[in-house]
Design a protein with these regions (language model features):
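N-terminal beta-alpha lobe that positions the nucleotide/phosphoryl donor
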Residues: 1-216
Length: 216
């Protein structure tokens, strides 16, 4: 990175990710002679944490969790309303999300764009496209990037799954295009396993991601 169009960077993360950026900002200043003003956004339990002390500025998000819709307690680093207030209050010009929390939230990248704040990462539109494994594989193919043989799109019926499996050969994988963490994925070693794997992958994907779509 050289000649950034921003100076005040809010860190929407904590612990090691936050410290890594603070250190990188100092190294950038030494190398380029341009200062990046780091702003640590922290919650109450972290008020004495190293990343809070080492940042140029710190802003409290309050309690570590908030009550989200549905009555669930979630991290305050996921509370868009609170984050928006913090970004405005600190006059942040850019946001570094690190990893986890809002780092892969397209809606948060959109929020930053609406506020005129640079999101250091991909755009919300790009996240949405690459977050879907079917769309991302199609984009890769369009760019002539080699990809493993696959169904070429969603496989909606068992009949189509059998046709694609015959073309691809066994063993193969059935995978949901959304989410991750090993959910919605099944290994199929032979034709006798296909039906159960296809139905269970779709069922698990719907429960985990609200979408029954799968591909081979």
């Amino acid at each position: 990175m050289s000649n950034p169009s921003f100076n005040r960077v809010a860190i929407v993360n904590r612990g090691e990710p936050a410290m890594r950026f603070i250190i990188a900002a100092r190294e950038y200043e030494q190398e380029h002679g341009e200062r990046l003003h780091t702003i640590a956004l922290y919650t109450d339990p972290d008020r004495r944490a190293m990343f809070v002390r080492e940042a140029d500025e710190a802003y409290s998000l309050g309690p570590a969790t908030y009550l989200a819709e549905g009555g669930q307690h979630k991290s305050s680093y996921l509370d868009y309303e609170r984050l928006e207030q913090a970004l405005i209050a600190t006059s942040a010009e850019a946001v570094w999300p690190g990893w986890g929390f809002v780092a892969e939230h397209a809606a948060f990248a959109d929020l930053c764009e609406r506020l005129g704040i640079v999101f250091i990462g991909p755009t919300g539109d790009m996240m949405r496209k690459l977050g879907d494994k079917i769309t991302s594989k199609q984009i890769a193919e369009k760019a002539e990037v080699p990809v493993a043989p696959w169904s070429g799109g969603e496989v909606a019926t068992l009949e189509n799954a059998r046709l694609h499996a015959e073309r691809l050969g066994y063993p193969l994988m059935i995978k949901a295009p959304a989410g991750g963490g090993g959910r919605g994925i099944r290994r199929v070693r032979n034709e006798s396993e296909l039906e159960d794997a296809f139905e269970s992958a779709r069922s698990e994907a719907e429960k985990a991601f609200g979408n029954r779509a799968v591909f081979l």
